[in-house]
């Protein structure tokens, strides 16, 4: 297998790590709902890298949605299966190499098979990736689970490099799934509901 140390990335995280500009992962003419604060990026025990959002709907549970999940930044789709779409980000000075384990990548979970973008597809900010659903992992309601990785490691949504989507900054409240999104003087709290308290607009 050769020398494993020849493949190391040092440092794994630079001390001045900054998140690239990310947009909200849905159309600019829609309001979605913040239903889950910082929680495991991938199953129980993983870093609290993920946030959850539900599309606009009058229905509850696992129902088909015509809303689209859209790319938060330019990149290349490296995975599209089992409800997951992973996009390796294309950044100035750090172009996408097609590997989610290097640089920044975004994982979008619970995307329906119908209309889901294919692996290998280049995307630009705002391009359609698929529809939110209950596919891929446990879910009892149609939603999007979104998380960031850097060099293959989950980046905590409320850590030193807080999740920032179009100026909405993630703040944890100490318990899994509890959290705020704050933009300027506006604050929204995670809630398993669709209400003004958790409504997020571009």
Predicted feature residues:
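Acidic, glycine-rich catalytic/binding loops that coordinate metals and/or anionic ligands
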Residues: 1-11, 15-22, 63, 70, ...
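Extracytoplasmic
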Residues: 19-21, 29, 46-50, 72, ...
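Short glycine/threonine/proline-enriched tight-turn/helix- or strand-capping micro-motif at secondary-structure
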Residues: 32-73
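A structural signal for short beta-strand/turn segments enriched in small hydrophobics and glycine
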Residues: 34, 69-71, 75-77, 120-132
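Active-site-proximal beta-strand/loop segments in catalytic clefts of secreted hydrolases
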Residues: 36-39, 53-56, 73-74, 80-81, ...
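Short glycine/serine/proline-enriched coil/turn segments at secondary-structure junctions
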Residues: 42-45, 78, 136-140
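Small beta-barrel nucleic-acid-binding modules, principally OB-folds
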Residues: 44-61, 93-99, 104-106, 111-112, ...
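Zn2+-dependent peptidoglycan hydrolase active-site motif and core
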Residues: 64-116, 140-143
């Amino acid at each position: 297998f050769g020398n494993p140390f020849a493949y190391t990335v040092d440092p794994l995280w630079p001390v001045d790590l900054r998140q690239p500009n990310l947009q909200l992962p849905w159309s600019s003419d829609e309001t979605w709902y913040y239903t889950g604060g910082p929680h495991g990026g991938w199953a129980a025990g993983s870093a609290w890298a993920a946030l959850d959002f539900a599309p606009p709907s009058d229905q509850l549970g696992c129902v088909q949605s015509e809303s689209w999940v859209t790319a938060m930044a330019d990149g290349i789709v490296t995975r599209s299966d089992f409800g997951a779409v992973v996009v390796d980000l294309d950044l100035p000075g750090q172009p996408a190499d097609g590997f989610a384990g290097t640089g920044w990548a975004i994982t979008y979970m619970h995307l329906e098979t119908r209309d889901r973008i294919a692996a290998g597809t280049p995307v630009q900010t705002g391009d359609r990736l698929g529809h939110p659903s209950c596919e891929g992992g446990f879910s009892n309601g149609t939603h999007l689970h979104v998380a960031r990785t850097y060099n293959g490691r989950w980046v905590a949504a409320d850590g030193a490099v807080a999740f920032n989507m179009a100026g909405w900054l993630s703040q944890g409240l100490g318990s899994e799934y509890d959290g705020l999104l704050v933009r300027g003087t506006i604050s929204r709290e995670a809630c398993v509901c669709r209400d003004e308290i958790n409504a997020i607009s571009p």
